[in-house]
């Protein structure tokens, strides 16, 4: 499955054809096959911030998931039911994920940062019948349980609470003799709640065939094989965990490195890379921005051979700093909760710093105009995926119970991602902005990413977010919210210096006419900057 290092992009992309089985179940067809191939094959190496270590083989994952499938079935969870899982990076998350897929139910992962109100909304929107969480989150579930009429089963992985089943007891009480459920490839398997710019979070529904899309993610983007130890630094409630902490690595038979702790520490992350034989790594741009603020020369990166980033574009300056210290290029990849990987700097191609890369094998990706026509090179437009003659694997089924918002993602024969970009003469895609993040100032269209990339080249800038701000003359102007690097203080002089810096680095009309120094940027649980929050703050003030 993996490409040889001397293989060219076109040699992989041109002949690629998706597998399209009638039936597919990742638990049966992938997990169990690795387990039968080698009963001791490692699947997970887990550590926490206290130094505790655990491991699981594919046999463990297979056996434990069969027991949990039996337990959930006995407690009333049926095929097609939605099971909400709210856990951090506890090792049980991977066993439960597999168990739910195995029994033909629908898994709906959520972050531990959800409030009781958030949980209530998810239960009632999805008509979920089961919740699996930990002791720390049990109270918020019990607070709203009586408002959730479909809730039948509550499972706790630690501690003891009245009305909850104990996970460890279930592993002891139930057999690992669970029949293979022959799920159809187009049968529902996952439900991710994803926020839009308006309204409640959308229920993004994927089928079992979604997993097949990661036959591209694992070998081609993550560059994984059976002997790799892969670390994806991601919250389990984010779809990126499905990409790079589950389907992608385990498709390739790689071992997952999981670090469970209360929060992110750049210094600790670098120490773990040095201490353990981690070979490949995936992180959000925010992770890399924080890592490069450390003294990278203090650490040994000889075991690390491949790094990727996803979530939003990574600034060229950060990629260059990381490469100087580690010898490795962070290879950006692009996709969404609604898709598998659509575009990337794959290991068999030469990357361009700051580029999204080229279309993924199996994906007809293009830049189109408002009429659904492909535009010429170096012309900005909407990033779109061709749906004919066949829809590519990994593309979501629908936004559940929301036909209007589902329809809004279609333009003729295209799926519209909601992102803007252009493609250069060599076929590399370059991100401009979310369609709703574009700044229109005095007739100019300005993407926030290019301004942020210019700002971060200045030593004083640790992070920035650029949004539109109202202006009587220009209609709107560029405003930059800036988190300063250690040792710098905000001042009028520094503001002027940063404005001049942007004018020198990029087209002068793009410079931020307004700047504000802040302690931290608002972000999603996956580390994406919430520009919409800053933009609304500007326009509503």
Residues covered by each model-derived region:
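Conserved AMP-binding/adenylate-forming core of the ANL superfamily
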Residues: 40, 44-98, 115-120, 166-172, ...
């Amino acid at each position: 499955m993996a490409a040889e290092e001397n293989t060219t992009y076109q040699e992989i992309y041109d002949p690629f054809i998706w597998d399209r089985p009638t039936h597919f179940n990742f638990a049966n067809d992938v997990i169990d096959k690795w387990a039968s191939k080698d009963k001791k094959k490692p699947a997970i190496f887990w550590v926490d911030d206290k130094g505790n270590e655990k491991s699981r083989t594919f046999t463990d994952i297979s056996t434990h998931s069969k027991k949990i499938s039996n337990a959930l079935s006995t407690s009333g969870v049926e095929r097609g039911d939605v099971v909400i899982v709210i856990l951090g990076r506890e090792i049980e998350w991977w066993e439960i994920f597999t168990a739910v897929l195995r029994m033909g139910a629908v898994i709906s992962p959520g972050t531990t940062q959800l409030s009781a109100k958030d949980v209530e909304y998810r239960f009632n929107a999805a008509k979920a019948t089961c919740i699996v969480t930990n002791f720390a989150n049990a109270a918020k579930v019990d607070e709203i349980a009586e408002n959730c009429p479909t809730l039948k089963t509550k499972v706790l992985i630690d501690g003891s609470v009245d009305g909850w089943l104990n996970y460890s007891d279930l592993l002891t009480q139930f057999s690992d003799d669970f029949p293979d459920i022959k799920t159809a490839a187009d049968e529902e398997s996952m439900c991710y709640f994803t926020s839009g710019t308006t309204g409640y979070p959308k229920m993004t529904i994927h089928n079992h065939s979604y997993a097949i899309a990661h036959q591209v993610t694992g070998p081609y983007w993550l560059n994984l094989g059976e002997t790799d130890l892969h670390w994806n630094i991601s919250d389990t409630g984010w779809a990126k965990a499905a990409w790079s902490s589950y389907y992608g690595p385990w498709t390739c038979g790689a071992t997952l490195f999981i670090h469970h702790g209360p929060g992110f520490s750049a210094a600790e992350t670098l120490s773990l890379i040095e201490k353990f034989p981690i070979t490949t790594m995936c992180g959000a741009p925010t992770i890399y921005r924080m890592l490069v603020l450390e003294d990278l020369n203090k650490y040994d990166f000889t075991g690390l051979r491949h790094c990727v980033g996803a979530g939003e574009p990574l600034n060229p300056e950060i990629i260059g700093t990381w490469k100087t210290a580690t010898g490795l290029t962070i290879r950006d990849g692009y996709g969404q909760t609604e898709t598998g990987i659509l575009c990337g700097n794959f290991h068999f191609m030469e990357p361009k710093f700051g580029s999204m890369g080229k279309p993924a094998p199996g994906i007809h990706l293009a830049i189109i105009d408002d009429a659904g026509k492909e535009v010429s090179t170096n012309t900005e437009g909407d990033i779109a995926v061709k749906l004919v003659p066949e829809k590519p694997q990994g593309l979501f089924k629908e936004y559940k119970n929301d036909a209007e918002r589902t329809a809004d993602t279609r333009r003729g024969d295209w799926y519209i991602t909601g992102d803007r970009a252009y493609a250069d003469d060599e076929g590399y895609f370059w991100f401009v902005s979310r369609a709703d993040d574009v700044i229109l100032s005095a007739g100019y269209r300005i993407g926030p990413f290019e301004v942020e990339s210019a700002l971060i080249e200045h030593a004083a800038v640790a992070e920035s977010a650029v949004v539109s701000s109202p202006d009587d003359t220009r209609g709107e102007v560029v405003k930059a919210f800036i988190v300063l690097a250690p040792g710098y203080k905000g001042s009028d002089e520094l503001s002027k210096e940063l404005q001049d810096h942007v004018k020198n680095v990029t087209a002068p009309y793009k410079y931020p006419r307004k700047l504000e120094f802040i302690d931290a940027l608002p972000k999603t649980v996956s580390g994406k900057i919430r520009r919409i929050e800053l933009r609304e703050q500007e326009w509503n003030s």
